């Protein structure tokens, strides 16, 4: 019997060739595994067929965050090369970032287009606090964005293990992305095409939340017990019409783990914006979301634990094993799973 308290219980072996390095084209031709909790059955289909499996009048909630070109390459004054990944903006025009390359407080980093960053603090979790400057002017997030658009690249997850290409700027961005701020895509959204959304909108009400996905989403759980894990936090906001649906009795499909966490955090706090650090797992299951659409996630990640919060650990392992046997493609550019 697997112990849902132990992080090692969420481990599984994934053959490396099943890690998707590129998305399926067109996006809605990805495979879709459907797990029905009422009947304990698994159905295999393609994503385009999603609408015919959803209960009538299901309200669909998407995350409209937009992935920014958060990865930039530069050098120190000494000439040493560095790579910087913006994790999130903070107050007072400061930014939490990851830096590959040794830096200390006070180090100035130089990028193209005259952009500079000064290292202000080294944080215990391995991140750094920096301020950005251009022509000696300290930059806000909105002033930095157009420069990132010019010199930055899309921050593909580490397991994709290749440099970002021009196509990734489209492929790694939901087609309804609107509010800039994420450094990782809400990947369940990547399967939708314009045509599919237009068709579904006639049948299902659409709603949005914003949660700016941080790099912490890829962070492995290093504790031995899930109760010892310190969850990362991410900024979210929920508009009034979405709150009305959350507070109603309508059936809700969350498109992705980020939407799930946002809705469930609101249910627990009644706060329509702020920092979400909710960790859903079998010991802290969802209270409001009825159905989940998601991709296949990394072993021992908080995301596979979230899946297990819906269907239990044993079932999660069984479903994932069947997906591996059926050669589903895993992770951000991979195939999808629907929990009914």
UniProtKB/Swiss-Prot annotation:
Its EC number is 2.4.99.17. It is found in: Cytoplasm. Its main location: cytoplasm. GO terms for biological process: queuosine biosynthetic process; tRNA wobble guanine modification. It catalyses: 7-aminomethyl-7-carbaguanosine(34) in tRNA + S-adenosyl-L-methionine = epoxyqueuosine(34) in tRNA + adenine + L-methionine + 2 H(+). GO terms for cellular component: cytoplasm. It comes from the Bacteria. GO terms for molecular function: S-adenosylmethionine:tRNA ribosyltransferase-isomerase activity. Keywords: Cytoplasm, Queuosine biosynthesis, S-adenosyl-L-methionine, Transferase. SUPFAM superfamilies: QueA-like. InterPro entries: QueA, QueA_dom1, QueA_dom2, QueA_sf. Pathway: tRNA modification; tRNA-queuosine biosynthesis. Transfers and isomerizes the ribose moiety from AdoMet to the 7-aminomethyl group of 7-deazaguanine (preQ1-tRNA) to give epoxyqueuosine (oQ-tRNA). Monomer. Belongs to the QueA family. NCBIfam families: PRK00147.1, queA. This is S-adenosylmethionine:tRNA ribosyltransferase-isomerase. It comes from Nitratiruptor sp. (strain SB155-2). The lineage of its organism: Bacteria, Pseudomonadati, Campylobacterota, Epsilonproteobacteria, Nautiliales. The gene is queA.
